[in-house]
């Protein structure tokens, strides 16, 4: 059964071969990377590149937070998007406002996107000490905000901020925040590892437990489950894949892993892993050979140097410096490469160095058109 954002609602916890919806948040969460500044035109260029590639959902920004994002959504209304649905992002209503008078919620409606993503508090620490409301009021803020948007015909994604930390602190309350969102009309529930510190095995346990507990609610309606992981413990991609294995079918990530602090889950690696190493269908799989181009194009627009050592798409991702490795690669490219680099638009290379052997030097000479006859290296 397909969910409202293109993913599957899920039945048993261990399903395979279901489509996984990729939701790109480069233009919003990725833009929070220190040193990364995107102009309005930069954002539009990246959005067009993502749409051309086949990204199903693109989060364009937070229209309630800054004028540039308001301008982005105004410009986006005039563009015909071939494949992507645009999403506008914002928070639940302010504690002092009713939904209908809340500027943030009304800015989301004014963006006129098919998808609206609202985040709310799952962690009692944030409820008690950050937004400083009662726990009952926080549940009301979630339900009323989502209801206000959903009743106006938008597809509603709920981002449960700090869900994993909240679950560890008070699992019952964290689950109640999800129920408030679901029952108010959210079609997708996204579990966010906002501080990026959850270990992979624990993430799997919590995702499975949350899904099972909400599915057991009497009269519960189906929702799509999502994941939003950060890389503070260098586990963002692994955690997202573990969440998919635990039943998640909506994955939020950024191109090249751009994001605040240590970054977000890397959409490039996630797409390659899911398309090449899992049984799940992912949008963009038919354009996988353009993945390196997409990665480098976004880096260029962002005025950031590509990471040569980035998995799959980096210049050195399939480079072989050691002589033993180089000799083996000449005989069979599978010897020291987990995939054919061409599948993601990359290429293998043998590197000339003091660690290299004849194969490395010979390969480089051939690339340069240098004749090695009688050199002892042929």
Predicted region positions:
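Generic beta-strand/beta-sheet core signal
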Residues: 61, 89, 119, 159-161, ...
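Catalytic alpha/beta core domains of metabolic enzymes, predominantly
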Residues: 195-198, 205-331, 335-337
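Short, glycine-/Ser/Thr-/acidic-enriched flexible segments
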Residues: 27-29, 93, 123, 232, ...
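Alpha/beta enzyme core
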Residues: 20-22, 28-58, 65, 73-81, ...
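Hydrophobic alpha-helical scaffolding
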Residues: 36, 62-66, 94, 135, ...
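Short, glycine/charge-rich beta-strand/loop segments that flank catalytic centers
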Residues: 90-94, 121, 312-317
């Amino acid at each position: 059964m397909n969910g409202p954002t293109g993913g599957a609602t899920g039945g048993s916890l261990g399903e395979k071969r279901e489509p996984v919806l990729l939701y790109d948040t480069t233009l919003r969460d990725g833009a929070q990377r220190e040193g990364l500044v995107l102009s309005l035109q930069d954002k539009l260029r990246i959005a067009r590149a993502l749409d051309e590639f086949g990204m199903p959902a693109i989060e364009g920004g937070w229209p309630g937070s800054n004028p540039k994002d308001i301008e982005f959504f105004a410009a986006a209304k005039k563009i015909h998007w071939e494949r992507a649905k645009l999403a506008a992002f914002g928070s639940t209503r302010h504690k002092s406002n009713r939904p209908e008078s809340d500027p943030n919620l009304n800015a989301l409606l004014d963006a006129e996107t098919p998808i609206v993503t609202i985040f709310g508090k799952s962690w009692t620490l944030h409820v008690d000490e950050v937004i400083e409301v009662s726990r009952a009021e926080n549940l009301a803020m979630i339900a009323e905000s989502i209801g206000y948007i959903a009743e106006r015909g938008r597809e509603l994604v709920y981002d449960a901020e700090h869900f994993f930390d909240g679950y560890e602190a008070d699992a019952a309350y964290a689950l109640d925040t999800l129920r408030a969102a679901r029952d108010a009309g959210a079609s997708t529930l996204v579990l966010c590892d906002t501080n990026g510190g959850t270990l992979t095995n624990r993430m799997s346990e919590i995702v499975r437990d949350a899904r099972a507990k909400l599915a057991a609610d009497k009269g519960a309606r189906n929702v799509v489950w999502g994941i939003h992981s950060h890389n503070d413990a260098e586990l963002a991609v692994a955690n997202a894949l573990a969440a998919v294995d635990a039943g998640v079918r909506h994955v939020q990530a950024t191109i090249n892993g751009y994001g605040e602090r240590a970054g977000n889950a890397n959409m490039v690696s996630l797409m390659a892993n899911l398309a090449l190493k899992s049984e799940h269908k992912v949008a963009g799989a038919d354009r996988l050979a353009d993945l390196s181009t997409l990665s480098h194009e976004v880096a260029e627009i962002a005025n950031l140097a590509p990471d040569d050592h980035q998995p799959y798409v980096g210049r050195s991702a399939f480079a072989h410096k050691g002589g033993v490795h180089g000799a083996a690669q000449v005989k069979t490219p599978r010897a020291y490469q987990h995939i054919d680099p061409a599948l993601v638009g990359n290429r293998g290379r043998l590197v000339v160095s003091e660690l290299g052997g004849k194969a490395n030097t010979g390969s480089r000479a051939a690339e340069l058109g240098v004749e090695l006859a009688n050199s002892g290296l042929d």
